[in-house]
């Protein structure tokens, strides 16, 4: 199995991270310790490594935070290995193929893991975050990073929309200690980022 970074672990869950591809995407595998089953967040790249991880950690489901090219390069490979891939309807057209559509405020269950879906448009129209119930874990894709929101210079991106998503769907409902695990780079917490929202609005990015 490829060496991974363990970003979080407790009695019930562990989070493995592998950094892949030309723009250093974070691929997360969230494993339910009670059943050994896992969910993979963003089949980004380096499919050979991801397939090894999928086998070693018993990945049963892939969910995509959004449809940008750097987050989906291994989608075909994991589907060919028999693992279902889910994405929002708004971003589904960006993927080469998929199996399921994700809806806002729903639950993705793998083993005893329950991932709550949170629609956070702005970076893309169909961007989605995932919170693991009963843990402080929040996977934000390219919506929220240390120091601000994701890039909104792309076609179909919108700065005002991503700010609203962050304020209403992430900062308002989640505790300060919530761990933010983004699609690239290091993690942060809601408490470290939420005081800076007005600064981000003022600077415009």
Please place each PLM-identified region on the residue numbering.
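Short, glycine/acidic-enriched loop or turn micro-motifs at the edges of active sites
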Residues: 34-35, 45, 69, 91, ...
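Conserved beta-strand hairpin/beta-sheet module of binuclear metal-dependent hydrolase folds
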Residues: 3-57, 130-141
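Active-site neighborhood of phospho(di)ester-bond hydrolases with catalytic His/Asp-centered motifs
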Residues: 40-41, 60-68, 85-89, 120-122, ...
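Divalent metal-coordination and catalytic microenvironments
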Residues: 30, 42, 66, 78, ...
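Active-site HxH/HxHxD metal-binding segment of metal-dependent hydrolases
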Residues: 24, 38, 45-116, 195-199
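Short beta-strand or tight-loop elements
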Residues: 11-13, 111-116, 126
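Short Gly/Pro-enriched turn/cap motifs at secondary-structure boundaries
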Residues: 18-20, 99, 119-121
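Metallo-beta-lactamase
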Residues: 124-205
